[in-house]
A protein has these predicted regions:
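N-terminal loops that bind phosphate or other acidic moieties
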Residues: 1-359
Length: 359
């Protein structure tokens, strides 16, 4: 696959990490009393390389694409929902639209491989910026959906490489230092289950859930289809070939975006099951990606907890969210600037003239 993957060096700096921890411990509070908020502040400081972190121009990117595997009945919804939801994102009516607007997060929607063309938006003939607060549509279609991976590869290696390259180039154009991941694609929980099972050697039974709302019989049928896919591609082991064989165009584009964001030392906020699957693939290509990631929540989708454990990840929320779109990332977002403010603005015992703990 002719693709140049950016080099991503480790940002682990023992001395700097210790200095940040000392700053946090010296704030006017018992040591560790702000719990995970302190850990979040520490992580963001280490990602950005400063003990006075500021999150600037956060970008929510919703990657959209259709899946040939959906023809096998692995979703409770028809494939038309993918393009209909893209229109909903652009109209401002989806959950992620509302939450991004509420928290001042720029919303970008990327057509990576939706099985329908979209009208040219006034703001998008040449990737011009939309009016402030309006969503932005990026047309980066590689194909009109993937092929049915129960019959053959979902993508050619060239299509997969093109999608990843699109993701890298897109991030280069985005302002700010924080990338929030979202997705839309009927059938993409199946893709996430397949990637987890294949890359981590986990039983597909353990990582396959209801997705958009399948009943028990539907989940059983979905598992049977996914087992067929894994059998079809059992000889494939290389992460890029696995992604091409059973991934999605939106997932491949997201993998590229994650790699580029990590190379630029942006804070990467993963949403739920599908976006974490993209992080998993990216980490198999460049392990230091994980040092730049924050995980918004533990999804109610079966398999996500196993994926988080595989990545050694501590999610911020555990609210049984399983909508996707980036809705969980947008919900958790206010915790990140709050954590940064604690590190930047909270007084120390010395500066406030407050007595420390008795010996």
């Amino acid at each position: 696959m002719s693709l140049v993957i950016p080099e991503i060096a480790s940002i682990h700096d023992v001395g700097f990490a210790a200095d940040v921890q000392q700053l946090l411990d010296g704030k006017t509070k018992p040591v560790g009393s702000l719990g995970l908020l302190e850990q979040l502040a520490h992580r963001i400081a280490c990602i950005l390389g400063t003990d006075k972190p500021v999150l600037e121009a956060p970008q929510m990117v919703v990657f959209a694409g259709d899946h040939g595997l959906a023809a096998q009945g692995v979703s409770a919804y028809p494939v038309d929902v993918t393009w209909q939801m893209v229109e909903n994102f652009m109209a401002g009516g989806a959950a992620v639209s509302v939450l991004a607007r509420q928290h001042g997060i720029a919303l970008n929607v990327v057509d990576c491989g939706v099985a329908r063309d979209f009208d040219v938006r006034e703001q998008d003939p040449h990737d011009k910026s939309p009016k402030e607060g309006e969503p932005r549509l990026w047309r980066r279609k590689v194909a009109y959906g993937t092929q049915d991976c129960s019959q053959g590869p979902a993508m050619t290696e060239q299509e997969c490489a093109m999608a990843m390259r699109n993701g890298m180039e897109l991030v280069k154009k985005l302002p700010g230092n924080a990338l929030l991941l979202g997705e839309m694609g009927i059938g993409n929980t199946s893709t996430a289950s397949l990637l987890l099972a294949k890359l981590c050697g986990t039983s597909v039974v353990e990582v396959t859930g209801m997705g958009t709302g399948l009943d028990a019989a539907g989940v059983k049928r979905k598992i049977a289809v996914l087992q067929q896919v894994l059998e079809k591609h059992k000889a494939v082991t290389d992460p890029l070939q696995v992604l091409a064989a059973m991934g999605g165009l939106e997932v491949a584009t997201m993998v590229g975006a994650v790699l580029q964001a990590a190379q630029e030392r942006r804070v990467i906020v993963a949403d739920g099951f599908i976006t974490t699957a993209a992080v998993l693939v990216a980490s198999r290509l460049r392990p230091a990606v994980l040092e730049r990631c924050v995980y918004a929540h533990r999804s109610g989708e079966r398999g996500h907890n196993l994926m988080l454990l595989e990545l050694g990840a501590q999610p911020l929320l555990d609210w049984q969210l399983r909508l996707g779109e980036g809705s969980g990332a947008a919900t958790a977002w206010p915790l990140l600037p709050a954590a940064c403010a604690i590190l930047r603005e909270m007084a120390s015992f010395n500066s406030a003239g407050v007595a420390t703990k008795c010996d």
